[in-house]
A protein has these predicted regions:
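N-terminal flexible/basic segments that precede or flank functional cores
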Residues: 1-35, 103-107, 111-114
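Short alpha-helical DNA-recognition segment
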Residues: 37-55
């Protein structure tokens, strides 16, 4: 690992955490717009309710494996890309939850004693 003198590893661009995590729904929304396809048309193609798809696109609901595979089949967006985005989003959201991070700290303190 190359380190720069006087530069905190947290301040190197590759180590920065984005201010706002990217939910996979944003990618789906952008692709729909670029292809001039409506949310309702995609929902119909993959056999889900328009409200379910809208919740994913708005970031209110996560993308699971089945949904990722259906979107891949309909739009040729790799399912693993959607799942990786979802996983990174979930991780960043958990790490930004102060209450949860305090809980983790407490668990680590207890585990250190064991």
């Amino acid at each position: 690992m190359i380190t720069l003198q006087g530069v905190s590893p947290d301040m190197i661009a590759n180590n920065l955490t984005p201010f706002q995590p990217t939910h996979p729904g944003e990618l789906i929304k952008d692709e729909l717009e670029a292809r001039h396809v409506s949310q309702s048309k995609l929902a119909e193609r993959i056999g889900v309710s328009p409200s379910l798809l809208n919740e994913i696109i708005k970031g209110k609901r996560g993308v699971n494996t089945e949904m990722a595979l259906m979107i891949e089949a309909a739009m040729d967006i790799p399912a693993d890309l959607l799942l990786n985005l979802q996983s990174a989003y979930n991780m960043q959201m958990a790490k930004s939850d102060i209450s949860f991070m305090k809980r983790l700290s407490s668990i680590r303190n207890i585990a250190a004693i064991l």
